[in-house]
Amino acid sequence: MTTLIHVLGSDIPHHNQTVLRFFNDVLATELPEQQIRHFIVASRDGISSADFPALRIETCVDKKTLAEAVIARAKANRNMRFFLHGQFNPTLWLALLSGKIKSEQVYWHVWGADLYEEASSLKYRLFYWLRRMAQKRVGHVFATRGDLAWYQQRAPRVPTSLLYFPTRMNPALTGMQVDKPLAGPMTILVGNSGDRTNRHQEALRAIHKQFGKNVRVIVPMGYPANNESYIAQVEGDGLALFGVKNFQLLKDQLAFDDYLNMLRTCDLGYFIFDRQQGIGTLCLLIQFGVPFVISRQNPFWQDLTEQNLPVLFYGDELDEALVREAQRQLASVDKHQIAFFNPNYLQGWRDALALAMGEPT
Protein backbone atom coordinates (compact mmCIF):
# COMPACT_ATOMS: atom_id res chain seq x y z
CA MET A 1 0.00 0.00 0.00
CA THR A 2 1.28 3.48 -0.90
CA THR A 3 2.09 5.78 2.01
CA LEU A 4 1.91 9.52 1.38
CA ILE A 5 3.76 11.90 3.69
CA HIS A 6 3.33 15.66 3.48
CA VAL A 7 6.56 17.59 4.02
CA LEU A 8 6.78 21.15 5.31
CA GLY A 9 10.55 21.29 5.10
CA SER A 10 11.28 24.77 6.39
CA ASP A 11 10.24 26.54 9.59
CA ILE A 12 7.85 29.13 8.10
CA PRO A 13 5.12 29.25 10.77
CA HIS A 14 2.53 31.43 9.01
CA HIS A 15 2.48 29.33 5.82
CA ASN A 16 2.86 25.99 7.59
CA GLN A 17 -0.01 26.75 9.95
CA THR A 18 -2.23 27.67 6.98
CA VAL A 19 -1.54 24.34 5.28
CA LEU A 20 -2.04 22.32 8.46
CA ARG A 21 -5.28 24.13 9.25
CA PHE A 22 -6.56 23.54 5.69
CA PHE A 23 -5.81 19.82 5.86
CA ASN A 24 -7.24 19.39 9.35
CA ASP A 25 -10.38 21.50 9.00
CA VAL A 26 -11.27 21.04 5.33
CA LEU A 27 -9.63 18.12 3.54
CA ALA A 28 -9.91 15.74 6.48
CA THR A 29 -13.69 16.05 6.33
CA GLU A 30 -13.93 14.68 2.80
CA LEU A 31 -10.78 12.80 1.72
CA PRO A 32 -9.43 9.39 2.75
CA GLU A 33 -7.16 9.44 5.78
CA GLN A 34 -4.20 8.02 3.86
CA GLN A 35 -4.19 11.07 1.56
CA ILE A 36 -4.10 13.77 4.22
CA ARG A 37 -3.04 12.47 7.63
CA HIS A 38 0.77 12.14 7.71
CA PHE A 39 2.95 15.25 8.07
CA ILE A 40 6.62 15.92 8.80
CA VAL A 41 7.18 19.57 9.73
CA ALA A 42 10.28 21.64 10.50
CA SER A 43 9.42 23.59 13.63
CA ARG A 44 11.88 24.74 16.26
CA ASP A 45 9.05 25.63 18.67
CA GLY A 46 7.01 22.49 18.02
CA ILE A 47 3.37 22.13 17.00
CA SER A 48 0.54 21.16 19.30
CA SER A 49 -1.09 17.98 18.02
CA ALA A 50 -4.24 18.98 19.91
CA ASP A 51 -4.67 21.87 17.45
CA PHE A 52 -4.81 19.43 14.52
CA PRO A 53 -6.53 16.27 15.79
CA ALA A 54 -7.17 14.87 12.30
CA LEU A 55 -3.45 14.86 11.46
CA ARG A 56 -0.44 12.88 12.63
CA ILE A 57 2.37 15.41 12.80
CA GLU A 58 6.03 14.60 13.36
CA THR A 59 8.07 17.71 14.11
CA CYS A 60 11.79 18.16 13.52
CA VAL A 61 13.80 20.93 15.15
CA ASP A 62 15.46 22.11 11.93
CA LYS A 63 15.73 21.56 8.18
CA LYS A 64 18.66 19.14 8.41
CA THR A 65 16.95 16.86 10.92
CA LEU A 66 13.81 16.82 8.81
CA ALA A 67 15.75 16.04 5.63
CA GLU A 68 17.50 13.13 7.34
CA ALA A 69 14.14 11.72 8.45
CA VAL A 70 12.68 12.00 4.94
CA ILE A 71 15.76 10.45 3.31
CA ALA A 72 15.72 7.51 5.72
CA ARG A 73 12.07 6.79 4.98
CA ALA A 74 12.56 7.17 1.23
CA LYS A 75 15.45 4.69 1.18
CA ALA A 76 13.69 2.21 3.46
CA ASN A 77 10.49 2.10 1.43
CA ARG A 78 10.58 3.04 -2.26
CA ASN A 79 6.77 2.88 -2.38
CA MET A 80 6.58 5.79 0.04
CA ARG A 81 5.70 9.10 -1.59
CA PHE A 82 6.37 12.63 -0.40
CA PHE A 83 4.30 15.71 -1.15
CA LEU A 84 6.55 18.74 -0.71
CA HIS A 85 4.65 21.89 0.20
CA GLY A 86 7.07 24.54 -0.95
CA GLN A 87 10.68 23.40 -0.84
CA PHE A 88 13.24 25.60 0.87
CA ASN A 89 15.36 22.74 2.20
CA PRO A 90 18.68 22.41 0.33
CA THR A 91 19.42 18.97 1.77
CA LEU A 92 16.26 17.56 0.21
CA TRP A 93 17.20 18.98 -3.20
CA LEU A 94 20.63 17.36 -2.92
CA ALA A 95 19.05 14.05 -1.87
CA LEU A 96 16.84 14.12 -4.95
CA LEU A 97 19.79 15.01 -7.16
CA SER A 98 21.94 12.19 -5.76
CA GLY A 99 19.19 9.57 -6.01
CA LYS A 100 18.72 9.05 -2.27
CA ILE A 101 15.14 10.09 -2.95
CA LYS A 102 13.77 8.82 -6.27
CA SER A 103 11.90 11.01 -8.76
CA GLU A 104 8.78 8.87 -8.61
CA GLN A 105 8.61 9.44 -4.85
CA VAL A 106 8.37 13.23 -5.06
CA TYR A 107 5.39 15.51 -5.71
CA TRP A 108 6.07 19.21 -5.31
CA HIS A 109 3.72 22.15 -4.81
CA VAL A 110 5.68 25.27 -5.75
CA TRP A 111 5.45 28.26 -3.41
CA GLY A 112 6.96 30.78 -5.81
CA ALA A 113 10.16 31.78 -4.07
CA ASP A 114 11.71 28.35 -4.49
CA LEU A 115 11.74 28.78 -8.28
CA TYR A 116 13.48 32.14 -8.43
CA GLU A 117 17.12 33.17 -8.23
CA GLU A 118 17.71 36.57 -6.66
CA ALA A 119 21.05 36.31 -4.85
CA SER A 120 24.19 36.88 -6.92
CA SER A 121 27.07 35.55 -4.82
CA LEU A 122 29.13 32.62 -6.08
CA LYS A 123 27.78 30.37 -3.30
CA TYR A 124 24.20 31.04 -4.31
CA ARG A 125 24.89 30.71 -8.04
CA LEU A 126 26.27 27.23 -7.41
CA PHE A 127 23.30 26.33 -5.23
CA TYR A 128 20.84 27.62 -7.85
CA TRP A 129 22.49 25.47 -10.51
CA LEU A 130 22.22 22.36 -8.33
CA ARG A 131 18.63 23.22 -7.44
CA ARG A 132 17.67 23.61 -11.11
CA MET A 133 19.10 20.17 -11.82
CA ALA A 134 17.19 18.68 -8.88
CA GLN A 135 13.94 20.37 -9.87
CA LYS A 136 14.07 18.55 -13.19
CA ARG A 137 13.93 15.24 -11.31
CA VAL A 138 10.66 15.85 -9.47
CA GLY A 139 7.98 13.30 -10.31
CA HIS A 140 5.14 15.81 -10.65
CA VAL A 141 4.95 19.57 -10.13
CA PHE A 142 1.93 21.61 -9.02
CA ALA A 143 1.86 25.40 -9.25
CA THR A 144 0.05 28.50 -10.44
CA ARG A 145 -0.40 29.00 -14.19
CA GLY A 146 2.40 31.55 -14.30
CA ASP A 147 4.85 29.48 -12.27
CA LEU A 148 4.12 26.41 -14.40
CA ALA A 149 4.95 28.39 -17.54
CA TRP A 150 8.22 29.53 -15.98
CA TYR A 151 9.10 26.03 -14.75
CA GLN A 152 8.25 24.29 -18.02
CA GLN A 153 10.74 26.46 -19.89
CA ARG A 154 13.47 24.68 -17.91
CA ALA A 155 11.90 21.27 -17.35
CA PRO A 156 9.52 20.59 -20.25
CA ARG A 157 9.42 16.82 -19.67
CA VAL A 158 8.19 16.88 -16.06
CA PRO A 159 4.41 16.38 -15.67
CA THR A 160 2.65 19.41 -14.20
CA SER A 161 -0.79 20.40 -12.90
CA LEU A 162 -2.45 23.64 -11.88
CA LEU A 163 -2.82 24.02 -8.10
CA TYR A 164 -3.34 27.03 -5.84
CA PHE A 165 -2.19 27.62 -2.29
CA PRO A 166 -5.16 27.21 0.10
CA THR A 167 -5.56 30.88 0.91
CA ARG A 168 -7.52 31.51 4.07
CA MET A 169 -10.73 33.09 2.79
CA ASN A 170 -14.33 33.34 3.91
CA PRO A 171 -16.43 32.53 0.81
CA ALA A 172 -19.37 34.40 2.35
CA LEU A 173 -17.47 37.66 1.80
CA THR A 174 -16.87 37.04 -1.91
CA GLY A 175 -20.22 38.36 -3.08
CA MET A 176 -20.29 41.39 -0.80
CA GLN A 177 -20.27 44.78 -2.46
CA VAL A 178 -17.64 47.13 -1.07
CA ASP A 179 -18.24 50.74 -2.03
CA LYS A 180 -15.12 52.85 -2.29
CA PRO A 181 -15.40 56.51 -1.25
CA LEU A 182 -14.46 58.81 -4.11
CA ALA A 183 -13.80 61.78 -1.85
CA GLY A 184 -10.64 62.21 0.17
CA PRO A 185 -7.17 60.73 -0.34
CA MET A 186 -6.74 57.21 -1.67
CA THR A 187 -5.41 54.53 0.68
CA ILE A 188 -2.60 52.40 -0.77
CA LEU A 189 -1.30 49.13 0.70
CA VAL A 190 2.41 48.53 0.06
CA GLY A 191 3.71 44.96 0.22
CA ASN A 192 2.45 41.85 1.97
CA SER A 193 5.13 41.55 4.66
CA GLY A 194 8.40 42.99 5.89
CA ASP A 195 10.42 40.87 3.48
CA ARG A 196 12.87 42.86 1.36
CA THR A 197 11.50 41.25 -1.80
CA ASN A 198 8.62 43.72 -1.49
CA ARG A 199 11.08 46.51 -2.41
CA HIS A 200 9.20 48.84 -0.09
CA GLN A 201 11.39 51.90 -0.52
CA GLU A 202 11.27 51.74 -4.31
CA ALA A 203 7.49 51.32 -4.15
CA LEU A 204 7.11 54.31 -1.83
CA ARG A 205 9.12 56.52 -4.18
CA ALA A 206 7.05 55.36 -7.16
CA ILE A 207 3.78 56.08 -5.34
CA HIS A 208 4.99 59.54 -4.38
CA LYS A 209 5.98 60.24 -7.98
CA GLN A 210 2.62 59.05 -9.35
CA PHE A 211 0.22 60.40 -6.73
CA GLY A 212 2.13 62.96 -4.69
CA LYS A 213 2.13 63.11 -0.91
CA ASN A 214 -1.63 63.39 -0.45
CA VAL A 215 -2.35 59.66 -0.34
CA ARG A 216 -2.58 57.46 2.72
CA VAL A 217 0.00 54.66 2.72
CA ILE A 218 -0.14 51.50 4.86
CA VAL A 219 2.89 49.18 5.07
CA PRO A 220 2.45 45.85 6.94
CA MET A 221 5.81 44.60 8.24
CA GLY A 222 4.76 42.26 11.05
CA TYR A 223 7.00 39.43 9.84
CA PRO A 224 9.66 38.14 9.41
CA ALA A 225 11.20 38.56 12.87
CA ASN A 226 14.51 40.28 13.60
CA ASN A 227 13.95 42.84 10.88
CA GLU A 228 14.28 46.04 12.88
CA SER A 229 17.02 47.68 10.81
CA TYR A 230 15.15 47.34 7.52
CA ILE A 231 11.86 48.41 9.12
CA ALA A 232 13.56 51.57 10.38
CA GLN A 233 14.83 52.35 6.87
CA VAL A 234 11.37 51.93 5.34
CA GLU A 235 9.78 53.97 8.10
CA GLY A 236 12.25 56.80 7.62
CA ASP A 237 11.62 56.97 3.89
CA GLY A 238 7.86 56.72 4.30
CA LEU A 239 7.65 59.51 6.84
CA ALA A 240 9.90 61.73 4.73
CA LEU A 241 7.72 61.22 1.65
CA PHE A 242 4.21 61.23 3.14
CA GLY A 243 4.45 62.62 6.66
CA VAL A 244 3.12 61.31 9.96
CA LYS A 245 -0.50 61.92 9.01
CA ASN A 246 -0.47 59.85 5.81
CA PHE A 247 2.06 57.10 6.53
CA GLN A 248 1.32 54.07 8.71
CA LEU A 249 3.80 51.25 9.23
CA LEU A 250 2.45 48.17 11.03
CA LYS A 251 5.26 46.56 13.04
CA ASP A 252 3.14 43.84 14.62
CA GLN A 253 1.24 41.08 12.88
CA LEU A 254 -2.49 41.78 12.84
CA ALA A 255 -5.14 39.28 13.86
CA PHE A 256 -6.83 37.92 10.74
CA ASP A 257 -10.10 39.83 11.22
CA ASP A 258 -8.18 43.05 11.86
CA TYR A 259 -6.17 42.42 8.70
CA LEU A 260 -9.39 41.99 6.70
CA ASN A 261 -10.79 45.22 8.10
CA MET A 262 -7.60 47.03 7.13
CA LEU A 263 -7.72 45.66 3.57
CA ARG A 264 -11.32 46.84 3.18
CA THR A 265 -10.16 50.44 3.69
CA CYS A 266 -7.70 50.27 0.79
CA ASP A 267 -8.20 51.65 -2.71
CA LEU A 268 -5.07 50.14 -4.27
CA GLY A 269 -2.38 47.57 -3.53
CA TYR A 270 1.25 47.99 -4.58
CA PHE A 271 3.30 44.79 -4.92
CA ILE A 272 6.41 45.07 -7.03
CA PHE A 273 8.22 41.84 -6.12
CA ASP A 274 9.74 40.20 -9.19
CA ARG A 275 8.24 36.78 -8.56
CA GLN A 276 5.01 35.06 -7.58
CA GLN A 277 4.41 36.02 -3.97
CA GLY A 278 1.66 37.13 -1.63
CA ILE A 279 -1.23 35.38 -3.37
CA GLY A 280 -3.14 35.29 -0.10
CA THR A 281 -3.17 39.06 0.20
CA LEU A 282 -3.94 39.48 -3.51
CA CYS A 283 -6.95 37.15 -3.19
CA LEU A 284 -8.31 39.10 -0.24
CA LEU A 285 -7.90 42.41 -2.06
CA ILE A 286 -9.74 41.04 -5.11
CA GLN A 287 -12.47 39.79 -2.80
CA PHE A 288 -12.90 43.35 -1.49
CA GLY A 289 -12.75 44.95 -4.94
CA VAL A 290 -9.28 46.45 -4.52
CA PRO A 291 -7.06 46.46 -7.66
CA PHE A 292 -3.29 46.30 -7.34
CA VAL A 293 -0.06 47.08 -9.13
CA ILE A 294 2.30 44.15 -9.81
CA SER A 295 5.61 43.68 -11.59
CA ARG A 296 5.69 42.34 -15.14
CA GLN A 297 8.24 39.86 -13.79
CA ASN A 298 5.61 38.35 -11.49
CA PRO A 299 4.14 35.49 -13.57
CA PHE A 300 0.93 35.51 -11.54
CA TRP A 301 -0.33 38.12 -14.02
CA GLN A 302 -1.06 35.15 -16.30
CA ASP A 303 -3.45 33.70 -13.71
CA LEU A 304 -5.10 37.09 -13.25
CA THR A 305 -5.73 37.65 -16.94
CA GLU A 306 -6.98 34.06 -17.33
CA GLN A 307 -9.69 34.96 -14.80
CA ASN A 308 -10.50 38.24 -16.64
CA LEU A 309 -9.22 40.38 -13.77
CA PRO A 310 -7.73 43.84 -14.37
CA VAL A 311 -3.94 44.03 -14.14
CA LEU A 312 -1.99 47.21 -13.41
CA PHE A 313 1.71 46.85 -14.22
CA TYR A 314 4.50 48.55 -12.33
CA GLY A 315 6.20 51.10 -14.55
CA ASP A 316 3.09 51.98 -16.55
CA GLU A 317 1.43 55.37 -16.25
CA LEU A 318 -1.01 55.41 -13.35
CA ASP A 319 -3.30 58.02 -11.85
CA GLU A 320 -6.42 58.04 -9.70
CA ALA A 321 -8.73 57.84 -12.73
CA LEU A 322 -7.07 54.60 -13.87
CA VAL A 323 -7.31 53.19 -10.35
CA ARG A 324 -11.04 53.99 -10.21
CA GLU A 325 -11.56 52.36 -13.61
CA ALA A 326 -9.78 49.21 -12.40
CA GLN A 327 -12.06 49.21 -9.35
CA ARG A 328 -15.07 49.41 -11.66
CA GLN A 329 -13.81 46.51 -13.78
CA LEU A 330 -13.13 44.44 -10.69
CA ALA A 331 -16.63 45.10 -9.38
CA SER A 332 -18.10 43.73 -12.62
CA VAL A 333 -16.31 40.36 -12.36
CA ASP A 334 -18.22 37.35 -11.03
CA LYS A 335 -15.78 36.57 -8.23
CA HIS A 336 -17.50 33.29 -7.40
CA GLN A 337 -15.95 31.87 -10.60
CA ILE A 338 -12.33 32.80 -9.83
CA ALA A 339 -10.27 29.59 -9.95
CA PHE A 340 -7.87 30.48 -7.13
CA PHE A 341 -10.64 31.46 -4.67
CA ASN A 342 -12.02 29.27 -1.91
CA PRO A 343 -13.85 26.92 -2.52
CA ASN A 344 -12.88 26.68 -6.20
CA TYR A 345 -9.30 25.61 -5.47
CA LEU A 346 -10.56 22.55 -3.57
CA GLN A 347 -10.96 20.38 -6.68
CA GLY A 348 -7.32 20.93 -7.55
CA TRP A 349 -6.34 19.56 -4.15
CA ARG A 350 -8.62 16.55 -4.49
CA ASP A 351 -7.04 15.71 -7.83
CA ALA A 352 -3.47 16.39 -6.66
CA LEU A 353 -3.67 14.11 -3.63
CA ALA A 354 -5.36 11.32 -5.57
CA LEU A 355 -2.60 11.58 -8.18
CA ALA A 356 0.09 11.44 -5.50
CA MET A 357 -1.49 8.24 -4.16
CA GLY A 358 -1.61 6.72 -7.65
CA GLU A 359 -5.40 6.79 -7.72
CA PRO A 360 -7.59 7.83 -10.70
CA THR A 361 -8.72 11.46 -10.78
Curated annotation (Swiss-Prot):
GO biological process, one term: enterobacterial common antigen biosynthetic process
Keywords: Cell inner membrane, Cell membrane, Glycosyltransferase, Membrane, Transferase
Topological type in the membrane: Peripheral membrane protein
Keyword Cell membrane part of the UniProt annotation: yes
Subcellular location(s) of the protein: Cell inner membrane
Pathway(s) where this gene product acts: Bacterial outer membrane biogenesis; enterobacterial common antigen biosynthesis
GO CC annotations on file: plasma membrane
Gene Ontology molecular function: 4-acetamido-4,6-dideoxy-D-galactose transferase activity; fucosyltransferase activity
UniProt catalytic activity: beta-D-ManNAcA-(1->4)-alpha-D-GlcNAc-di-trans,octa-cis-undecaprenyl diphosphate + dTDP-4-acetamido-4,6-dideoxy-alpha-D-galactose = alpha-D-FucNAc4-(1->4)-beta-D-ManNAcA-(1->4)-D-GlcNAc-undecaprenyl diphosphate + dTDP + H(+)
EC number: 2.4.1.325
InterPro entries recorded: WecF
Superkingdom as given in the UniProt entry: Bacteria
Membership in a protein family: Belongs to the glycosyltransferase 56 family.
Function text: Catalyzes the synthesis of Und-PP-GlcNAc-ManNAcA-Fuc4NAc (Lipid III), the third lipid-linked intermediate involved in ECA synthesis.
Protein name, entry field: TDP-N-acetylfucosamine:lipid II N-acetylfucosaminyltransferase
Species of provenance: Pectobacterium carotovorum subsp. carotovorum (strain PC1)
Gene name, Swiss-Prot/TrEMBL: wecF
